[in-house]
Design a protein with these regions (language model features):
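Conserved lysine of the Walker
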Residues: 98
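Interdomain "pre-motor" coupling segment immediately N-terminal to P-loop NTPase/helicase cores
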Residues: 2-53
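Loop/turn-to-beta-strand initiation segments
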Residues: 86, 113-115, 146-149, 177-183
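Pre-Walker A (Motif I) flank of P-loop NTPase domains
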Residues: 83-89
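Post-Walker A helix-loop "phosphate-sensing" segment adjacent to the P-loop in P-loop NTPases
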Residues: 106-119
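N-terminal pre-Walker A segment at the start of P-loop NTPase domains
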Residues: 55-79
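Hydrophobic positions on the alpha1 helix immediately C-terminal to the Walker A/P-loop
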Residues: 101, 105
């Protein structure tokens, strides 16, 4: 009701100026309240997503990263992949924009009120380990399962012990064909055995991730290195 009161005089003037009926005026007045609540809900969904920064696709320099198909990336903003429970994997070396793109898609999903959560792979593993030690692993797995879109950043930057790999597999298996997951990694798929220290687990994880997945292989240069070079020139 607060927004309706704030805009009351404005709407009354609009009704008079445009010779509107009482019902038409009430609809316009109510729309202010609805829009305000919707905006608050969107801000809340984005905040819950725990994104590392607020970067959207329009902030991404597709000209610098020419190995990326811009149309394919922008198609992810339609969120059709979410409805199909498909995954996205951004593969490339450090600094090429993997996290930016993953975050942008996540923000787009949150703005459409899809439950979304961003977490670094190492932090995810630590949470699952802690939950297992405290005999609440099932609850923690259900927590991460509930998100329509889960973004796991920096898979492969740190090695994952065999027992931890089993925990990671349980989550991926739980979400398989039911929820969408976005992963960013700097490790080629044929080297995942080295990350998980177990080829059987590595293959099982890969099988479930890649079965319904869009793989974006980014082969360009580092944005961070470019920014450093620009600053150095200045």
């Amino acid at each position: 009701m607060k927004q309706m009161l704030l805009h009351l005089d404005e709407v009354l003037d609009f009704i008079t100026a445009n010779n509107l009926s009482f019902t038409e005026g009430l609809v316009k007045l109510t729309s202010h309240e609805i829009d305000f609540k919707e905006a608050n809900m969107i801000r809340s969904m984005v905040k819950v997503g725990a994104f590392p920064h607020h970067k959207e696709l329009n902030d991404f320099d597709f000209e610098f990263q020419s190995s990326i198909n811009e149309q394919e990336i922008r198609d992810f903003e339609t969120l059709r992949f979410l409805e199909a429970a498909e995954n996205i994997v951004f593969l490339g070396s450090s600094g090429v924009g993997k996290t930016h793109l993953a975050t942008s898609i996540g923000i787009a999903a949150a703005k459409k009120r899809y439950s979304t959560y961003f977490i670094k792979c190492h932090d995810l593993i630590q949470q699952l380990k802690k939950a297992k030690l405290e005999n609440r692993l099932e609850a923690r797995l259900r927590h991460f399962f509930k998100y329509k879109l889960l973004i796991i950043d920096e898979l492969g930057y740190l090695p994952i012990e065999k027992n931890d790999a089993k925990l990671f597999f349980q989550l991926i298996d739980l979400r398989y064909e039911k929820r969408s997951t976005i992963l960013t990694t700097n490790i080629n798929f044929n080297s995942w055995d080295d990350v998980f220290y177990d080829p059987v687990i590595a293959n099982a994880i890969l099988d479930r991730i890649l079965h319904h997945a869009h793989v974006i292989n980014i082969t360009g240069k580092s944005y961070r290195l470019r920014e450093y070079m620009i600053q150095d020139d200045e």
